[in-house]
Design a protein with these regions (language model features):
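Short acidic (Asp/Glu) and glycine-rich catalytic loops that position anionic groups and cofactors
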Residues: 46-53, 92, 127-132
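Glycine-rich phosphate/diphosphate-binding loops and the adjacent beta-loop-alpha structural elements
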Residues: 55-59, 96-103, 129-136
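Fold-independent oxyanion-binding glycine-rich loops
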Residues: 3, 10, 42, 67-68, ...
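Generic secondary-structure signature for well-ordered alpha-helical cores
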Residues: 2-6, 18, 40, 44, ...
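Conserved anion/nucleotide-ligand pocket segment
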Residues: 1-70
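Oxyanion-binding "anion nests"
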Residues: 63-102, 106-109
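Generic, ordered loop/turn and secondary-structure boundary motif
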Residues: 53, 65-66, 76, 123, ...
Length: 197
């Protein structure tokens, strides 16, 4: 058995940085309270996330794979796309996708999710962990960040944990891509317990 490490989400997050020419390395401007949104398939959990406990919370284990959708979607179907091989190698562990986006608007997020789905990337998926997009709160013609992801992820009838501390809106939890992890959501927070093996 390998060494076990644990990381959890943060209480607050930064919607707008105080970084400027005169202050290139400011402290975080933590103005927003983290509120996770959790779905099973395309339906939101009935138990409020902050009331989830060890019995009613989300608990799932598997291999982590993912990153920034802006970059990943450009690899689908190319000679650098080894996702199918990774998925097949770790199918017995199951796959937990962690994804976030930087410059994609909500329509581009939906297209990226569709493209990854059609490339077979979500085979053996056990859960999705979705970070806050840089376009947090954007709504375009009735499409928001949640429905953009759920259009693809919701089909798999697995937990979809959204607004997680990942990606381009800090702070971000360290994620070890390829690691095996036990993921839990309880009392309004997410915890990743890594098992290095």
């Amino acid at each position: 058995m390998g060494k076990k490490l644990s990381v959890s989400g943060y209480d607050m997050w930064e919607k707008e940085s105080l970084k400027n020419e005169d202050n290139p390395t400011p402290e975080y401007n933590l103005t927003e309270k983290k509120i996770l949104r959790c779905f099973y398939g395309d339906k939101e959990y009935e138990t409020p996330v902050d009331e989830m406990d060890s019995d009613t919370g989300i608990h799932v284990s598997g291999r982590l794979i993912g990153g920034c959708m802006d970059c990943l979607v450009n690899l689908t179907g190319t000679e650098y796309d080894y996702v199918s091989e990774f998925n097949d190698k770790y199918k017995d562990d199951g796959i937990i996708w962690f994804l976030e986006s930087c410059d994609l608007n909500v329509f581009a997020i939906r297209r990226a999710m569709w493209q990854m789905e059609k490339a077979g990337w979500f085979k053996h998926v056990k859960a999705f962990i979705i970070g806050r997009p840089l376009v947090f709160g954007q709504d375009m013609m009735g499409l928001d960040q949640y429905s953009a992801v759920l259009a693809a992820a919701g089909k798999y009838k697995v937990p979809v944990i959204m607004d997680v501390d990942l990606g381009h809106l800090p702070p971000a939890m360290p994620v070890i891509s390829g690691a095996y992890a036990d993921v839990s959501v309880e009392k309004g927070n997410i915890t990743l317990n890594y098992v290095l093996r």
